[in-house]
Each structure stands twice: as C-alpha cells, then as structure tokens.
C-alpha cells in the first residue's frame, strides 16, 4: 500500500517512519510512504508557502500555488489517487474508516496544512476531508501519521501475529480487555487467577466480559447491535455494578 504526504516539515514525518510497527512494515515492503517537501514546489527564491489573509485577520494562510504544483507533479505518473485534506472540518476518522482504507487500491495522498489553514481553493484538488478529533493542532502532520499508523497495522504481515490487530480496541465494536504480564504479583496487586488457569474457553469469556465492562463504563455509546450473549453478560454486569453501588452507600462513614 502506498501513502504520500505533502508537508513543509518532511523530517517530522520521516523521523516517525523509522520506528516501531510502521518502520518494520516499510522495511518489509508491506507499505510505502513518499514524503514531499512543499517548499520544493514554490517559485520564488525564498521558498515562501504562506501570505497574509485577504480581508485581514490574525495569522498567515498557506498559498494555493505550491499545493497545486505538488499535486500536478505527483499525478504525472498516472496512478490512481485519493487526495485527503487533514482538516478539523472533515469526516471523523475511526477504526471502521481505517479498515475501509486498507481495501483502497488508490494511493492515499495526505495534504498537511499549517498556520491558519490553506487557501480555500485547495478544495478543488481534494477528494475527501478527514479530522482525527474536535481539537486544534499546529498542523496536519500528526493527523497524517495517526491515520497511516492506524491503517498500516491492519495490513497483512504488519504485526506478525494476525490476531493482534483483530483483538485491538474497536475492531469488534468494544474497547479492549485488560492485559497482564509478569510478575504475577506486584505491590499486592495480583493477576486475575482465570488468566493463569490455562482454560482458554474461560479466558476468552472473561476477556469478552471485561471488554464489555470497560466499554459500558467508559464508552457506552459503542454498545450497539449486541448479540443475545453480550446482552446477557451486560445485564449481569449491570446487576454487579448496582450491587456494588448499594454496598458502598451503606458503608459506615468514619468522621
């Protein structure tokens, strides 16, 4: 799978791509990321990419010409592309969209803005706008890396163990279950006995139950289209939680 990133900070992108799961996937040829320095597509000796906004106002706006030149250049190879603008106005990125992108045959090209944004005429060059959340960042580089990382880890061979990505949070509609490793006990906190039992069926049920518990407590909005078995587990959890609340309410208070 091929990604492209248009940015004024190519070293920012390239540094991240050297490490971790994404770095290994690139070394194995599972994915490819081409980074383009927007300043290479300017026409003045100062390699200027921004200017004052028409109508006044604070900050600077990125000019359309460098983006236009860069996009025309990369399109000259004739490959099919989906050009994506990273923008707080875009569609919210999530795990479902990451999975959809893994099936995309086109090159995914990410446009990274800076300053107060990009000249509105950039919209005539893009296919889609994507946001990673309702907050303000200094530029589109972090969102581009978030999306690339999220997609790459879903590609066959990227994680080594194919079950790893299947069991990630959100892949089955829930948050993840708790994870433990050695030592069995740390400062009085023990690993749940069920995980040491070797009974894989019971462990799977425990993990499903704990994933539902975490989702119910932290992201109840994700609890949709539950199976009958999940509904049964959820009802048991609700009874358990309500019982705990009542017990806590009746505990004596020491003044």
From Swiss-Prot:
Its main location: cytoplasm. It comes from Thermodesulfovibrio yellowstonii (strain ATCC 51303 / DSM 11347 / YP87). GO terms for cellular component: cytosol. Its EC number is 2.1.1.228. Keywords: Cytoplasm, Methyltransferase, S-adenosyl-L-methionine, Transferase, tRNA processing. Homodimer. This is tRNA (guanine-N(1)-)-methyltransferase. It is an enzyme of class 2 (transferase). GO terms for molecular function: tRNA (guanine(37)-N1)-methyltransferase activity. It comes from the Bacteria. The gene is trmD.
